């Protein structure tokens, strides 16, 4: 299996396949990852999501893809956290 695959989550299109295949599916908060280039079924529902082998891979993918995109009117202009470091932090 590849370490990372992208998909769009409208009605379970990331989370369900991940669950069926024993992978990690992650749907970030709407606007966290740019949706430029995505053909939406509904702007309010479609999210870019990732399918990965592990939570660590998902955190790394989010760290790389997250951030404000001025070309996406729904993109959130908020700082990107260090998601990989957050995994190592005590609970």
Could you say what each language-model-derived stretch is?
Residues 1-19, 51-55, 62:
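Active-site-proximal alpha-helical scaffold in enzymes
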Residues 21-25:
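Short, hinge-like loop/turn segments at secondary-structure boundaries
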Residues 27-91:
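A short helix-breaking turn/cap at a secondary-structure junction
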């Amino acid at each position: 299996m590849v370490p990372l695959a992208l998909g769009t989550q409208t009605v379970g299109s990331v989370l369900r396949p991940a669950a069926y295949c024993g992978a990690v599916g992650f749907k970030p908060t709407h606007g966290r990852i740019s949706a430029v280039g995505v053909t939406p079924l509904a702007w309010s529902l479609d999210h870019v999501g990732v399918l990965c082998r592990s939570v660590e891979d998902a955190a790394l993918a989010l760290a790389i893809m997250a951030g404000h995109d001025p070309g996406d009117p729904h993109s959130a202009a908020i700082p990107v956290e260090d998601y990989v470091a957050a995994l190592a932090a005590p609970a």
